[in-house]
Design a protein with these regions (language model features):
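Short Gly/Thr/Asp-enriched flexible loops that form oxyanion-binding sites at enzyme active sites
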Residues: 1-5, 69-70
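Short glycine/serine/threonine/alanine-rich loop segments
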Residues: 6-7, 78
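Conserved Walker B
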Residues: 59-60
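PRPP-dependent phosphoribosyltransferase catalytic core
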Residues: 68-124
Length: 124
């Protein structure tokens, strides 16, 4: 996505690594998929006032991960301009919740999954 828009990429990390030095922004993020809470970290060197941020994630279920990242963006003084996800689980509340907060685009929205047959119903 960043390559298409010709903008920099900033990764939010679940653990402090040696390439994240100095002051950081941090927030707690609940992962529906993994059933646990993570501390998400972004170096203050890469995010701050005047930045415009588009959040990108692979899956959207209950919206807690993107909600936590949006809080981190707000805490930094940057502006959240929208969010994009690859797959949204439309049968869970995350998409509706986030659309009340910011512009959200999903490449695919799964409206139903049949556990017995494995059939997936996509939103049109």
């Amino acid at each position: 996505v960043a390559e298409i828009f010709d903008v920099p990429v900033v990764f939010a990390k679940k653990t402090q690594t040696k390439n994240i030095a100095g002051d950081v922004y941090t927030t707690k993020v609940e992962s529906f998929t993994h059933g646990r809470v993570y501390d998400i970290i972004v170096s203050k060197e890469f995010l701050g006032e005047g930045d415009r941020v588009l959040l990108i994630d692979d899956f959207l279920a209950n919206g807690k991960a993107l909600e936590g990242l949006a809080k981190l963006v707000k805490d930094s003084g940057a502006e959240l301009v929208g969010a994009g996800v690859v797959i949204e689980k439309g049968f869970q509340p995350g998409g509706d919740f986030l659309r009340k907060q910011t512009h959200l685009e999903s490449l695919a929205i799964v409206d139903a999954m049949d556990e017995k047959t494995g059939e997936i119903t996509f939103r049109e």
